[in-house]
């Protein structure tokens, strides 16, 4: 798979357990049952979900749910992951967890594309950023380029913005 997509809105099956949420996707991969279980075990471990594997998704915190969603997005081992508003609706501790997961994906050689309005959270983990206004890219560059741009400050960030 070339790209996997994680929508802004929750995509977990709330009445299924954490493991079942992975399993339902794994069943469509063509892997043997043994390989499916092994892949689920790896994802549970990698995303700190092992202790929650029997918990229903309905009872997960925002950060736990987001980790499960990212784990599901990686089941087919994509080259890129598109994260739509990954920092929406999660607490500050979970933001740090998600930032760590994004860094880990990058370290694994998985490209991460993020669309998000939470500028501070996003700019601290990205290599390159694009500022769009009314559907048009008006500025691109490193996070420092964006933060220090008068244009970015006037059309989006505001004069008092800092990382």
Question: What annotation goes with each model-predicted range?
Answer:
Residues 16-35, 46, 159-160:
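ABC-type ATPase nucleotide-binding domains, specifically the catalytic core motifs of the NBD
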Residues 56-60, 64:
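Conserved ABC ATPase signature
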Residues 77:
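Conserved catalytic motifs of ABC-family nucleotide-binding domains
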């Amino acid at each position: 798979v070339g790209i996997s997509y994680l929508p802004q809105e929750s995509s977990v099956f709330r009445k299924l357990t954490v493991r079942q949420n992975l399993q339902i996707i794994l069943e469509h991969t063509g892997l043997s049952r043994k390989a499916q279980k092994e892949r689920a075990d790896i994802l549970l471990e990698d995303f700190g979900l092992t202790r929650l594997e029997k918990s229903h998704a309905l009872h997960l915190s925002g950060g736990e749910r987001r980790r499960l969603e990212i784990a599901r997005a990686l089941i087919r081992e994509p080259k890129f992951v598109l994260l739509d508003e990954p920092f929406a609706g999660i607490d500050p501790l979970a933001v740090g967890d998600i930032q760590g997961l994004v860094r880990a994906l990058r370290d694994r050689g998985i490209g991460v594309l993020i669309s998000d309005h939470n500028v501070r959270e996003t700019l601290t983990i990205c290599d390159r950023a694009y500022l769009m206004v009314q559907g048009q890219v008006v500025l691109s560059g490193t996070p420092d380029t964006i933060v220090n741009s008068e244009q970015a400050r006037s059309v989006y960030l505001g004069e008092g913005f800092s990382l």
